[in-house]
Amino acid sequence: MTKVGLRIDVDAFRGTREGVPRLLEILSKHNIQASIFFSVGPDNMGRHLWRLVKPQFLWKMLRSNAASLYGWDILLAGTAWPGKEIGHANADIIREAAKHHEVGLHAWDHHAWQARSGNWDRQTMIDDIARGLRTLEEIIGQPVTCSAAAGWRADQKVIEAKEAFHLRYNSDCRGAIPFRPLLESGNPGTAQIPVTLPTWDEVIGRDVKAEDFNGWLLNRILRDKGTPVYTIHAEVEGCAYQHNFVDLLKRAAQEGVTFCPLSELLSETLPLGQVVRGNIAGREGWLGCQQIAGSR
């Protein structure tokens, strides 16, 4: 039996309003629990369009057929009009998710975090995280115990900033196994549970065809030598490609692969490491990457 952490990122208004209820129904039918990370502030995802001037981002949008993948409402959100606030407008959906699944913070403003947090000072970052946590806690009526940085935009500054909130774990980076990042003080910080597997949009049209994706992914899962963690998006697997996700769950069960919330992957003893800026194929710009202590 292979256990895989299932992380669901919710980036936009439509992903919350339409994608999450569909995913909740699918997961219930398959008796699966996951970790769902919500963006709760304004939906400004359309402001990423300026990145089309960057060849790598443009190619990603073209090969993944972004217009049909996400929909024009997501691709234009927050451009010609102010972005709609996601959290309180979809409070019932978020509360329903929290009844059955582990719920954490993805971002207050997903676009702002992904586009600008790398240049924020620590206090600006702390204030932004606090705003998101406060809003999510108001909605679900209980403490939030985990978070996942939008776009995996995380480095040492993010690690230090999140220590102020005493969360159980964060999932801010890409890597191989859960670990504790070393703080500037020399002490171990809050546990990190890295994502180990590629997302749909990172590989479709580059490494694999859409119709071959599930078999390709299951092969990666079964060959994973670390602690497999897979991320889906409410805007993708909860909308245009929900049928692919259902097929993945059926095929996974046949292969002896089970999915679980990320917290089930934690252990009492974890190795030490760091989160450093790096790059991965299929994703434009830098993101947080796991570096085990002592490695280079």
Swiss-Prot record:
Location of the NodB homology domain: 2-260
Group of enzyme by EC: hydrolase
InterPro entries membership: ArnD, Glyco_hydro/deAcase_b/a-brl, NODB_dom, Polysacc_deacetylase_ArnD
Stored Pfam families: Polysacc_deac_1
Pathway stated in the Swiss-Prot or TrEMBL entry: Glycolipid biosynthesis; 4-amino-4-deoxy-alpha-L-arabinose undecaprenyl phosphate biosynthesis; 4-amino-4-deoxy-alpha-L-arabinose undecaprenyl phosphate from UDP-4-deoxy-4-formamido-beta-L-arabinose and undecaprenyl phosphate: step 2/2; Bacterial outer membrane biogenesis; lipopolysaccharide biosynthesis
Gene3D superfamilies in UniProt: Glycoside hydrolase/deacetylase (3.20.20.370)
Tagged with keyword Lipid metabolism: yes
A cellular component annotation (GO) from this entry: membrane
Record-listed E.C. numbers: 3.5.1.n3
Recorded superkingdom: Bacteria
Reactions catalysed, as given in the entry: 4-deoxy-4-formamido-alpha-L-arabinopyranosyl di-trans,octa-cis-undecaprenyl phosphate + H2O = 4-amino-4-deoxy-alpha-L-arabinopyranosyl di-trans,octa-cis-undecaprenyl phosphate + formate
Protein keywords: Antibiotic resistance, Hydrolase, Lipid A biosynthesis, Lipid biosynthesis, Lipid metabolism, Lipopolysaccharide biosynthesis
GO biological process: 4-amino-4-deoxy-alpha-L-arabinopyranosyl undecaprenyl phosphate biosynthetic process; lipid A biosynthetic process; lipopolysaccharide biosynthetic process; response to antibiotic
Function according to Swiss-Prot or TrEMBL: Catalyzes the deformylation of 4-deoxy-4-formamido-L-arabinose-phosphoundecaprenol to 4-amino-4-deoxy-L-arabinose-phosphoundecaprenol. The modified arabinose is attached to lipid A and is required for resistance to polymyxin and cationic antimicrobial peptides.
Protein family membership: Belongs to the polysaccharide deacetylase family. ArnD deformylase subfamily.
UniProt cross-references to HAMAP family, sorted A to Z: ArnD
The protein's name: Probable 4-deoxy-4-formamido-L-arabinose-phosphoundecaprenol deformylase ArnD
Originating species: Shigella flexneri
